[in-house]
A protein has these predicted regions:
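...captures the hydrophobic TM-helix bundle architecture rather than a specific catalytic motif
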Residues: 1-193
Length: 193
């Protein structure tokens, strides 16, 4: 069910970005709504404020590297659990938590920069609303994941998991990897296209 939802979600986002907007711009006369309409993406609309769109390099690329690294540190922690290597498990989880919180810090900085220096706000038309909704919703899920990782880390410190019994650890790990994969899709669709 979740896979179908996210396939539909990203498919719809891809459709809007790559099919609807060009069609409205008159690339296909059958879909043209207004003869003189020219689409521009990103756009604030005809009466929206001017803004600078967010680029893919800089903080977004750094955040992508941070999340991918956090997936690797979490996998390394999992290997430590399976080998009953508690120091590897705990260090890997701690690094993953630090990387997740760092991602959130950079995202907060990116939002502040967008609002104060780029003019990119929630009121900046469809682009601004879409940008903040998609990245903010993902940031919320990263926050939930970081909290769950902290709970699992506390349980690991108390010795609650073994190589044979660690369902909660695996559930949180799957969630975290899912958040990583969703970010890759967002990075491509929101920042590159």
């Amino acid at each position: 069910l979740h896979e179908a939802f996210f396939a539909a979600f990203f498919g719809a986002l891809f459709y809007v970005r790559n099919v609807s907007v060009p069609a409205l711009a008159g690339m296909d006369p059958a879909f043209t709504l207004w003869k003189d309409f020219t689409a521009a993406w990103p756009s604030a609309g005809p009466k929206g404020p001017s803004f600078t769109p967010m680029g893919a390099w800089g903080i977004p690329a750094l955040n992508t590297a941070i999340l991918l690294t956090s997936g690797a540190t979490l996998t390394w922690a999992h290997w430590g659990l399976l080998k009953n290597n508690r120091s590897q498990l705990n260090l890997g989880l701690l690094l993953t938590i630090i990387l997740g919180v760092t991602f959130l810090g950079f995202q907060a900085y990116e939002y502040h920069h967008a609002y104060t220096e780029m003019g990119l706000t929630l009121g900046a038309g469809v682009y601004g609303a879409t940008f903040f909704m998609l990245t903010g919703f993902h940031g919320f899920h990263v926050t939930l994941g970081a909290v769950m990782l902290m709970v699992v880390y506390g349980r690991c410190l108390k010795g609650h998991f073994s190589a044979e019994r660690h369902f909660a650890f695996e559930g949180v790990a799957w969630y975290w990897h899912f958040v990583d994969v969703v970010w890759l899709g967002l990075f491509i669709l929101v920042y590159w296209l």
